[in-house]
């Protein structure tokens, strides 16, 4: 993945990588440390401080997602070319490209040459971002015409609960309802009080007053 340097950075240890503001860095691993990334610049590698860079968008990168999970996700997509890039299970440090085509999900190994450039076939790229952009208009396959396109986010079905008891608000911001009412859950991050909507009103309600239900309204 690509990142843009926001500030100059001068390495102070042998395993760090110096760079200048505006440099385009190739980030190899975002999981080594919460404050440091492993990256490359001009063929040299090392660690860089996370707060000195700004990552370019890469919604197609799913990290260490298993191949089976990638195939399950892409199998639900409607359009050919829906894709993701993941870290290879069989070759740590390498990447795999998973692409939907027809009823199948095809797998492509992302290769790297001696200079650290990425490729699928012949054309080489400085980063995964460049490879992805190129194959949006040039087929990733030599046998079929498959152009990369972003995954469509599947909207989540609303979650509903049903009231077990009447609840009368005691404070401002609470949601009143009657036993049997269906309540759409808007936030269930708190273990005791959830936020919901019912009869055109929104507010907080006690979790132990409701029960889960499968219902589309």
From Swiss-Prot:
- Which part of the chain is the SH3 domain? 1-58, 156-215
Choose one Gene Ontology CC annotation of this protein and give it.
Answer: plasma membrane
| Intracellular or extracellular location(s) | Nucleus; Cytoplasm; Endosome; Golgi apparatus
**Coarse class of the protein's main subcellular location:** nucleus
SUPFAM superfamilies attached to this UniProt entry: SH2 domain (SSF55550), SH3-domain (SSF50044)
Molecular-function GO term, any one: epidermal growth factor receptor binding
Q: Which UniProt keywords apply?
A: Cytoplasm, Endosome, Golgi apparatus, Nucleus, Repeat, SH2 domain, SH3 domain
Swiss-Prot/TrEMBL GO biological process terms: regulation of MAPK cascade; signal transduction
UniProt domain SH2: residue ranges: 60-152
Q: How does it assemble?
A: Associates with activated Tyr-phosphorylated EGF receptors and PDGF receptors via its SH2 domain. Also associates to other cellular Tyr-phosphorylated proteins such as SIT1, IRS1, SHC and LNK; probably via the concerted action of both its SH2 and SH3 domains. It also seems to interact with RAS in the signaling pathway leading to DNA synthesis. Binds to and translocates the guanine nucleotide exchange factors SOS. Interacts with phosphorylated LAT2.
The UniProt similarity line reads: Belongs to the GRB2/sem-5/DRK family.
* Function in brief: Adapter protein that provides a critical link between cell surface growth factor receptors and the Ras signaling pathway.
Q: What is this protein called?
A: Growth factor receptor-bound protein 2
Q: Which gene encodes it?
A: GRB2
């Amino acid at each position: 993945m690509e990142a843009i340097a926001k500030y100059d950075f001068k390495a102070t240890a042998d395993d760090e990588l110096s760079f200048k503001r505006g440099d385009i860095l190739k980030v190899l691993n975002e999981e080594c440390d919460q404050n440091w990334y492993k990256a490359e610049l001009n063929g040299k590698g090392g660690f860089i401080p996370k707060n000195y860079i700004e990552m370019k968008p890469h919604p197609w990168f799913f990290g260490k997602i298993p191949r089976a999970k990638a195939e399950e996700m892409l199998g639900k997509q409607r359009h050919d070319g829906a894709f993701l890039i993941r870290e290879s299970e069989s070759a740590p440090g390498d990447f795999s490209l998973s692409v939907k085509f027809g009823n199948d999900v095809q797998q492509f190994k992302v290769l790297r040459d001696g200079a650290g450039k990425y490729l699928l076939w012949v054309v080489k790229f400085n980063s995964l971002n460049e490879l992805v952009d190129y194959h949006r208009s040039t087929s990733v396959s030599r046998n079929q015409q498959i152009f990369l396109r972003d995954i469509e986010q599947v909207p989540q079905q609303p979650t509903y609960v049903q009231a077990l008891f009447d609840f009368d608000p005691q404070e401002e911001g609470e949601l009143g309802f009657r036993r049997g009412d269906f309540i759409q859950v808007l936030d269930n991050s708190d273990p005791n009080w959830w936020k919901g909507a019912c009869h055109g009103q929104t507010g907080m309600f006690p979790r132990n007053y409701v029960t889960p239900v499968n219902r589309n309204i």
